[in-house]
Amino acid sequence: ILECVFSCDIKKEGKPCKPKGEKKCTGGWRCKIKLCLKI
C-alpha cells in the first residue's frame, strides 16, 4: 500500500483517490504529484 505524498483533491470517476481524513489512497488509486493514478 502506497501512501500519498500530497493530499489529493482531484477526483476521477466521481471518487477521490484519497478520501478526506484518510492517510492512504483507496480503491486502487494512488497520488503522484497531486495527480490520481489508477494502479
From Swiss-Prot:
Its main location: secreted. GO terms for cellular component: extracellular region. Pfam families: Toxin_20 (PF08089). It comes from the Eukaryota. PROSITE patterns: HWTX_2. It is found in: Secreted. Disulfide bonds join 4-25, 8-31, 17-36. Belongs to the neurotoxin 12 (Hwtx-2) family. 06 (TXP1) subfamily. Inhibits voltage-gated calcium channels (Cav) in rat cerebellar granule cells. Has insecticidal activity to crickets (Acheta domesticus). Is not toxic to mice. This is Omega-theraphotoxin-Ba1a. It comes from Brachypelma albiceps (Mexican golden redrump tarantula).
